[in-house]
Amino acid sequence: MAQSVPPGDIQTQPGTKIVFNAPYDDKHTYHIKVINSSARRIGYGIKTTNMKRLGVDPPCGVLDPKEAVLLAVSCDAFAFGQEDTNNDRITVEWTNTPDGAAKQFRREWFQGDGMVRRKNLPIEYNP
């Protein structure tokens, strides 16, 4: 069963953080790429620390080995300097899909006792 093998690595482009630049009086969209660099099919889900300000599309999916997906990370307009942005980040969570599973995302893959890996991408706001 796939769950007994720890999920392999993913790569993100950018690799360490996401940067949004002022002005913040309109919605910004930034694209990141997630690449499944492992030899197994994975399911991924994206979480944000501030759901009012940050959105990700598509928020989840399935990637075959070596497959990549482009995600649109959006930042809604907000009053820069008047809201706490220190802890804003996006977290990519991924896990191996069960053997024989269809290539369709299932939330329950993350709720069992299988291993889930995480990668945090802090968000930096340039004034």
UniProtKB/Swiss-Prot annotation:
It is found in: Cell projection, Pseudopodium; Cytoplasm, Cytoskeleton. Its main location: other. Gene3D superfamilies: Immunoglobulins (2.60.40.10). It comes from the Eukaryota. Residues 9-126 form the MSP domain. InterPro entries: Ig-like_fold, MSP_dom, Nematode_MSP, PapD-like_sf. Sperm. GO terms for cellular component: cytoplasm; cytoskeleton; pseudopodium. Coiled coil: none annotated. It holds the Pfam family Motile_Sperm. The modification N-acetylalanine is found at A2. Keywords: Acetylation, Cell projection, Cytoplasm, Cytoskeleton. Central component in molecular interactions underlying sperm crawling. Forms an extensive filament system that extends from sperm villipoda, along the leading edge of the pseudopod. Helical subfilaments are built from MSP dimers; filaments are formed from two subfilaments coiling round one another; and filaments themselves supercoil to produce bundles. Around 30 MSP isoforms may exist in C.elegans. This is Major sperm protein 19/31/40/45/50/51/53/59/61/65/81/113/142.
